[in-house]
């Protein structure tokens, strides 16, 4: 991902304020609610029968935290996202058979959740930088599919 120095600063400054537990669970939960077909990858998570069930599900929250942990790692390696996400790409492609389009959906949901959490601080410039990052991460996660 090519970010200007200003974009890198915007991304890392905001990310330093993110509550990974809260935002991760909310982002994954929203993905599962807004795009219900993604729930098929989470059969072992128990009750996903309603938006309230999804958003309150401890397994969704725990996995969301894990997802954002990996995203955080990516932010530390923006110049090598494909290398950083190589193992996760392989896992999601070969073992889990996740449609790579879902990575884009989750990235866009994450941007919405960040905008909700940070309000006016999530300026159009910050959003543009995050859109670049989530697109780069989605591309890196889809790399094994190519």
Curated annotation (Swiss-Prot):
Belongs to the globin family. Keywords: Acetylation, Heme, Iron, Metal-binding, Oxygen transport, Phosphoprotein, S-nitrosylation, Transport. Red blood cells. Heme b binds at residues 63, 92. The modification Phosphoserine is found at residue 44. The keyword Hydrolase does not apply. CDD domains: Hb-beta-like. The modification Phosphothreonine is found at residue 12. PANTHER family: HEMOGLOBIN FAMILY MEMBER, HEMOGLOBIN SUBUNIT BETA. One of its GO terms (biological process) is hydrogen peroxide catabolic process. Residues 2-146 form the Globin domain. The modification S-nitrosocysteine is found at residue 93. It comes from Mandrillus sphinx (Mandrill). InterPro entries: Globin, Globin-like_sf, Globin/Proto, Hemoglobin_b, Hemoglobin_oxygen_transport. Heterotetramer of two alpha chains and two beta chains. GO terms for molecular function: haptoglobin binding; heme binding; hemoglobin alpha binding; metal ion binding; organic acid binding; oxygen binding; oxygen carrier activity; peroxidase activity. GO terms for cellular component: blood microparticle; haptoglobin-hemoglobin complex; hemoglobin complex. Disulfide bonds: none annotated. The modification N-acetylvaline is found at residue 1. This is Hemoglobin subunit beta. Involved in oxygen transport from the lung to the various peripheral tissues. The modification N6-acetyllysine is found at residues 59, 82, 144. It comes from the Eukaryota. Signal peptide: none annotated.
